[in-house]
Amino acid sequence: MLLHIPAIFTAEEVSRIRAALEQAEWADGKATAGYQSAKAKHNLQLPQDHPLAREIGEAMLQRLWNHPLFMSAALPLKVFPPLFNCYTGGGSFDFHIDNAVRDVHGGRERVRTDLSSTLFFSDPEDYDGGELVIQDTYGLQQVKLPAGDLVLYPGTSLHKVNPVTRGARYASFFWTQSLVREDSQRTLLFEMDQSIQRLTHDVPDHPSLIRLTGTYHNLLRRWSEL
């Protein structure tokens, strides 16, 4: 499942965040890539322990943990602290698959990368190229969203970032370990949850809603890993 979640941050908030990112000191993005990925990665990255990365990352996670659509789709158990990158001057990241497990806080905790997310901090008209290209069972998708919007997709997906030939593309990316590791099961639960929410709005007193909601929770109970 590939899902577009709009307006995590407002235009005014994005403007302030981007201004701060433009003034930050960036490092070579290869530092956080695996052996194979490092050969394909040509971008800049904010050091993970940078105060700005922590500040924006905490604000992002607070928004997402209170966002009904993200919670419904991701069913998050753990989230890897958001990272921040910049593509400019021809920077790109060729096709790769993210590492299956990421160490957090010096290896004291691990996160399985069931889901990948990218949150854009540059508007499409501010740069040429830079499309996030995702290849999975749903086909080849090119993603270039408005600033403040997020795309959520399976961590198993082959993906790349096209070269940025004009301007700069600022974004955040992170991984989520879901309560439900299989994408097909998460998709089924997401579609069921969205249907229950619509029915609750349209026919709030329908007697089948209780049974349908119970079925959702029984499936979640069957498939959850804690």
Swiss-Prot record:
Q: Is Metal-binding included in the keywords of this UniProt record?
A: yes
Give residue ranges for domain Fe2OG dioxygenase. 78-178
Q: By its UniProt entry, which SMART domains does this protein fall under?
A: P4Hc
**Coiled-coil residue spans:** none
Q: What is its EC number?
A: 1.14.11.-
Cofactor annotation remark: Binds 1 Fe(2+) ion per subunit.
User: Which Pfam families has this protein been placed in?
Assistant: 2OG-FeII_Oxy_3, PKHD_C
Question: Where does this protein hold Fe cation?
Answer: 96, 98, 159
What does this protein need as cofactor? Fe(2+); L-ascorbate
Q: Which domain of life is it from?
A: Bacteria
GO BP of this protein: DNA damage response; intracellular iron ion homeostasis
Broad class of enzyme this protein falls into: oxidoreductase
Record GO terms (molecular function)? 2-oxoglutarate-dependent dioxygenase activity; iron ion binding; L-ascorbic acid binding
Sorted keywords for this record are:
Dioxygenase, Iron, Metal-binding, Oxidoreductase, Vitamin C
UniProt-annotated binding residues for 2-oxoglutarate: 169
* PANTHER family for the chain: PKHD-TYPE HYDROXYLASE YBIX
- Enumerate the HAMAP family for this protein: Hydroxyl_YbiX (MF_00657)
Name of the molecule in the record = PKHD-type hydroxylase PA14_58580
Q: Which organism is it from?
A: Pseudomonas aeruginosa (strain UCBPP-PA14)
